[in-house]
Swiss-Prot record:
Pfam families hit by this protein: Ribosomal_L29 (PF00831)
BP terms from Gene Ontology: translation
Any one GO MF annotation of this record: structural constituent of ribosome
Gene label: rpmC
Keyword Cytoplasm in record: no
Record keywords: Ribonucleoprotein, Ribosomal protein
Keyword Ribosomal protein set for record: yes
UniProt family annotation: Belongs to the universal ribosomal protein uL29 family.
Signal peptide (UniProt feature, chain positions): none
Descriptive protein name: Large ribosomal subunit protein uL29
Alphabetized InterPro entries for the sequence: Ribosomal_protein_uL29 (IPR050063), Ribosomal_uL29 (IPR001854), Ribosomal_uL29_CS (IPR018254), Ribosomal_uL29_sf (IPR036049)
């Protein structure tokens, strides 16, 4: 994923399925980053925070949508 800084407006236009796909990709990337760090191969440690924040943004959007559907 090239653009890790996902904008709220961009996330709000995507479907729930697309959001879950992005979430799964980001979780896999975070796993790979942790694995690389454990092996001592990770050079760009700032990527951790970018991936974590992107995951949080997607989860927030999904929660917002699920709460709005209940009412």
């Amino acid at each position: 994923m090239n653009d890790l800084k996902l904008l709220r407006s961009k996330l709000s236009t995507e479907t729930i399925e697309e959001l879950y796909k992005k979430l799964n990709l980001l979780k896999k990337e975070l796993f790979n980053l942790r694995f690389q760090q454990a092996l001592g191969e990770l050079k760009n440690t700032s990527r951790f925070s970018l991936v974590k924040k992107s995951i949080a943004r997607i989860k927030t959007e999904l929660t917002k949508r699920s709460n709005s559907e209940e009412y």
